[in-house]
């Protein structure tokens, strides 16, 4: 008959084996996150992914307005900018909904000072003549506009998406041009820290004092591995507001845009 101490020893060993197996299986099922090849290079060597906009209407053409970027869904490339740019159109052109209207001519995205690399937008995917523009406090939860682009442009780099949420205190980076930026040869890289994530958007604290947020709306926000985690939306007091990828995927689902979120 097996004595009591031997039984305890066997049970202990079986427990250790079970825990080890669980850890091994768990590690095997966790996908390895691969850094983008350019992320550890100098910013001057990064591919062109931070863009600005030229938007033409019959009454007016806007040059170098706000920021934008391209996104790799895993199946296609789409153009992205910030919805609150419609507040400008409302004030200056009289638009009253998320629709570019009958006087719209064209929209191009390009790296600042390099219009020869421009991509032209073909279709405004999430336009909605029934969606009121509203004020920023209502726009911040839905501050993404997405576009089908004309053809492919190998001179511009579409960002890959990170689908997991940004965590409190995580460091992320905004990449784009601002109105007060002195050197426009390359977009500015701004280091940010997540203060609180509310799902469709999150609050950040800038970790640099001379950031001048004006004009950076629509800039992509990337994580330490170079993956897209948000879009620069606005400012509330001392905190910045970043539109989260969660709302972007809501748009993908709504408009039947195929995407691959199996990586991370």
Per-region residue spans from a language model:
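C-terminal motif of bacterial Sec signal peptides marking the signal peptidase cleavage site
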Residues: 24-26
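Active-site region of chymotrypsin-like
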Residues: 43-66, 150-157, 181-264
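Bacterial signal peptide processing site
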Residues: 28-30
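Sec-dependent signal peptide recognition
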Residues: 12-18
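Short, Lys/Arg-enriched N-terminal segments with co-localized hydrophobic residues
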Residues: 1-10
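Serine endopeptidase catalytic core focused on the charge-relay Asp
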Residues: 65, 72, 80, 90-91, ...
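Catalytic histidine site
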Residues: 36, 40-108, 233-237, 241
């Amino acid at each position: 008959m097996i004595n009591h101490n031997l039984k305890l020893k066997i049970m202990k060993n079986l427990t250790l084996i079970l825990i080890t197996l669980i850890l091994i299986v768990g590690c095997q099922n966790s996908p390895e996150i691969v850094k983008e090849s350019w992320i550890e290079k100098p910013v001057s060597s990064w591919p062109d992914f931070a863009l600005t906009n030229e938007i033409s209407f019959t009454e007016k053409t806007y040059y170098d307005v706000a920021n934008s970027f391209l996104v790799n869904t895993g199946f296609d490339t789409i153009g992205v900018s910030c919805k609150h740019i419609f507040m400008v159109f409302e004030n200056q052109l009289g638009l009253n909904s998320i629709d570019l209207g009958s006087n719209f001519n064209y929209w191009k995205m390009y790296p600042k000072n390099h219009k020869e690399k421009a991509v032209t937008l073909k279709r405004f995917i999430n336009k909605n003549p029934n969606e009121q523009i509203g004020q920023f406090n209502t726009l911040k939860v839905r501050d993404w506009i997405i576009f089908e682009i004309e053809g492919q442009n190998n001179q511009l780099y579409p960002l890959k998406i990170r689908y997991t949420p940004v965590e409190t205190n995580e460091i992320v980076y905004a990449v784009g041009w601002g109105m007060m930026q002195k050197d426009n040869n390359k977009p500015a890289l701004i280091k940010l820290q997540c203060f609180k994530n509310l799902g469709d958007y999150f609050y950040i604290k800038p970790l640099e004092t001379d950031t001048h947020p004006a004009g950076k709306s629509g800039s992509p926000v990337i994580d330490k591995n170079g993956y897209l985690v948000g879009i620069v939306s606005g400012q509330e007091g001392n905190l910045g507001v970043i539109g989260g990828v969660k709302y972007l995927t809501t748009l993908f689902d709504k408009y039947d845009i195929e995407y691959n979120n199996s990586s991370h």
